[in-house]
C-alpha cells in the first residue's frame, strides 16, 4: 500500500546515486568507492530511527543523533564518510595524486526528510503493543541487516509464548515467576510475555492497580540481554516506550552484553548472577 511504499523509501530508496556520464577511468575511481559505501546503507536507516530517531530528525542532523561508533558498526562507514557523501569535499585521486572535488549531494533531501518523518509517525502509531487491534508490526518495516539484526516476526513470538504456556500451564499466573531473553533482537518476545503477565488473573489479583502491576512485571519478572548497542536501544525503546510511556522510570532489567560470546567463554551464568542476581533473589 502507499504507506508501505512511503516507509520503504526510508529504508530502500532514500539514497539517490548520482548518474552522470564520466570517463571509464573515473568510473573506476571515486564513483565506485561511493557506490560501495552506499551499498546497504539505506537499509540501515529504519534501524537507526527505531533506536535514535525523534521528530525533527533530518538529513542535516542525521549524523549528530547517532553515536559515531554505532554508526560505523552498523553501516561500515564512518560519520565523516557519510558527511562526504552528503556534503561533498576534496579527495586525492589514488592513481594520479591529483586533488579533485566530489560534489556530494547523493541524498535527495526532500525525499529523505519526508520519509524519515513518515517512519517516525508510523513508529508512534504502532508503538502501543498492548493494543490488540493493531494488525501491523513496526518491525515489518525494518529491513534486516547483519545476522544478529534479523527480527523475529510477531506471529513467531506469539507462538513461542503460546507453546511455553502450553508446556507450563499457569506459568504467567504466579507473580514470583521470572522470564528472560538472553539474546534480544527487537524486544518483541519480551513484550509478548509482558502482555501475558499483565493480563493474568493471578497477577491482577496480586496487583489490582494497573501501574503497580506493570511496574512489578518490569522490575521483577522480565529480564533481557542485547548483543549490540543499537539492538539494545531498539529493544529497550520498544519495550519501555519510545518516550518511556510504558516504563515510566521503573527499574527495568535489560543489559548490553553479547550472551553468545559469554556462553562460549563459559561466563554467562556468572554474568547473569552478577547483573540480575539480586532481582532474581527477590522474585
Regions found by a protein language model. Name each.
Residues 29-283:
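SAM-dependent methyltransferase catalytic region
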Residues 1-28:
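Accessory nucleic-acid engagement/destabilization modules that flank
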